[in-house]
Amino acid sequence: MNTNIIQKVQTYLGAQALYKDSTTTNNLFAGRNLPSFVKDFLLKKYAQGEEIDRAGLTGFLNKVMPTGDLRSQLIMGQDITLLTRFSVNIDLVHNVRRFGIPDLGIKEREGQIPEYVASKHPELVDGEIWGIIKMCLMPDDDGKKSHVEMVDFKPFKPYTSVDVSFVQNVRKNFTTSEWLDLIISSMEYEPDSFETMHQKLEFITRLLIFVEPRLNVVELAPKGTGKSYVFNNISKYGWLVSGGKVTRAKLFYDRAKDQSGILKNHDFCAFDEIQTIVFQEPAELQGALKSYLEQGKATIGDKEFTSECGLMLMGNIPLTEDRKPVNKRYFDALPDNFRESALLDRFHCFIEGWYLPRINKSMIYKGWTMNIEYFSEIMHTLRVQNVYAELFDKLVDYDRQAGVREFTAVKRIATAYMKLLFPHWISANDVNLEEFDMYCLQPAIHRRGIIQQQCHYIDPEYKAEMPAIWVKER
């Protein structure tokens, strides 16, 4: 990244600027499975310019992420304080709020959250959470067995709120190319390692689902292009499903447990290596997905499930020697359960992952950039900013015969690009129409057009061509 951008980062981002050098800091986190948004928070906490207070950071990690056999320490009666990722499950049958820590092998049936802790923290609901917990071993009510009890909890939320206007003002000082490089560097990649602007735009398109509610995306790419990393490391508001079994109950609502599923409390849910995931009761799941992808709600028994969570399907696709898909029918790479036009037509956006480079060590960024934990909070906050969708309506005209799904898809994708690349556009007068067309509208039409074409291959009843959608003249 060039020195001009770095100077702007230091000048305009202020406290949200962070110096990254994983070659010297990764060993500080060795043996601790931490996502980037946690690492950036800790590095910022102990940063002194380009240097890190290594002793202070190590001491903090030893305190809240102790090593050793923690289960044995619990059995010996020790209290343990831990910064960790844990899951919460409300057991209505036994009237108990349970938690588990997958990284430590503590199962949900072994952990309990008492009412005095739960009542102070409404976020302790079904799902996965990052936070600092204090726990100890306590006897069950009957005295015959014991359980791990959470006696205190502090959510991992360094930013209780973020001011979007700050980022909007910062963005005014960067060109579009510079802002794009800043986003990529905050994701820990060296912008100069991407060969073209097209590659960079393809890469950051993965972030659209972070900023736009109920955006449904498909990405097919070769292995090694960093799909898992983006969705597992940048934001605590997403959920990554990697392998295993998926049911309607797990995604939407479990009637037996009266418990909401993954989609309820997350900004997005990404299926990684979708070819390896087993979808049980596929007919039930497919029916719920069709309804949810279309309307943001699904009926499970007598329960209506609603959410703003977006869905991401990620899979591998075979390529030729010149890195083009072997088969023009891209969706043949998906599992049978997802290879139905009526379901796929409800997805908005397609990412052509074969244009992305294979990730290697030379692509890891070193230098000043934006703190990714801060940027993830900005993206989360942008989801509820309606000004960009209103701008789209003012800027765009379209063929009145356009289908609702096609137009909705283009609007959501273009709106997401505005939030990500042009957050400072808050009135029509702010908008550069040429850039809007180039970076927002045309990519949106193209990405929805791929969905359209692929559905046509499956079922010729679906039109292959996109309707006319264009920028209004001023």
Task: Name each model-derived stretch.
Residues 205-206, 299, 333-338, 361-364, ...:
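Short secondary-structure capping micro-motifs at structural edges
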Residues 158-162, 266-271, 318-326, 350-359, ...:
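Short acidic (Asp/Glu) and glycine-rich catalytic loops that position anionic groups and cofactors
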Residues 190-323, 327-329, 345, 467-470:
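Conserved ASCE/P-loop NTPase catalytic core
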Residues 312, 333-348:
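C-terminal, active-site-flanking charged/polar segments
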Residues 318-337, 359-369:
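Conserved P-loop NTPase catalytic core
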Residues 63, 343-344, 348-474:
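Conserved NTP phosphate-binding and transfer environment spanning the P-loop NTPase/kinase superfamily
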Residues 1-187:
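Extended, charged/polar low-complexity intrinsically disordered regions
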Residues 284-288, 338, 342, 370:
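A general alpha-helical scaffold signature found inside nucleotide-binding enzyme cores
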